[in-house]
Amino acid sequence: MDEKQLSIDIVGLLGACSDALDCIEAELVNISNKHGKRVAYMSVCMAKYWNVESDALQDLAICALLHDNALTQYIAEEVQKNHGIDVSDETLNEKTNLHCIYGENNIAKIPFKTNVSNVILYHHEHANGRGPFKKVWQETPLFARIIHLTDVVDAIASSWEFKQEKWDICCEFLVKQKGQLFDDECVEAFFKMISKETFHSFEDGTFESKLWAMVPRKKQMVDWNTCKNIADFFANIVDYKSPFTSKHSMGVAEKAAQYAKYIGYDVLDVEKMYLAGALHDIGKMAVGNEILEKPDKLTDEEFDKMKNHAGYTYLILSQVDDFEEIRDWAALHHEKLNGKGYPFGKTADELNEQERIMACVDIYQALTEERPYKKGMSHEKTCDILDDMAKKGFVDAEISHKIRTCFH
């Protein structure tokens, strides 16, 4: 593919991703939403203690936002091996190293400006060397030590019911764990740079704008390989959410780009279609697995919750600056030309070609892919179903017709 570059608000996009990841943590361990952004804000505040320069500060924020990026992958493997996961299992702490290894490998896809090697890998290490990899604080990168402290502090604060006591409880814990979980320097930095007012900003929501003021979100020009890496990063996180939809996002991304190239889109639009395909189901991170993995027909109430995922995708991607086009291509994949789709009930005159393509590609991928409860449907049978849907006014007939030859 010819080298052309796409302009993306990468920090904003990764911040939106952290909100989606937080939905998984909220479902699993009852940590409140915006966990990643709170960890990022405290981490950036603490880093000022060491006068960390702007590029490194941005990279720290990204690492903090994505510190639990491998959570869905880790859980998926545990579920597959053990037919479930018990969060009270005492051996989970010993298995934390897997989540760190996967996370370190995943963020290699992100275009950092500075060296962040081992930051995610060692973000659960203890100062006294009793963490997953037995590294003492002197062997652990500063950013990993900062994220470890802020991650634990936010988990404690999130679990404490009484707002007025959160600060005192966290401070007592840090003093007690000085030299054990956390090194003296990081504890000192916390008390110098974080205050009770910081916790108040978590309650009233003002911390998020303060975070972006400290870490400006500037659009970056990215080439195709970088764009694909970012897209694949998101798709893998979504697809690991449930084995019932494993590889679905990757499949939609690949086929959306394949179709766009087939009908003559230019390089940048092919890239954007790939990215939109990778992101189209990011809203499913906010839908419980009891619904995603239910083998029986969903009740009306359950189906309404399932349908919410498209709206969640729209809301998540709305956080990204100048991303409206890709947001719409991604989020409107369940809209129908006759106005009977969701989340907005848009009609034919409100749906552009890219949104219509994504709707058809999503259906094609869902029908042809193999899932735990069904075998994949043949190309011909799937195309027949799409043609029938076109006749009924659900999808675009021309796109359905071209898919028959494009994906053959």
Segments predicted by a language model, with ranges:
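Histidine- and acidic-residue-rich, metal-dependent catalytic cores
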Residues: 2-408
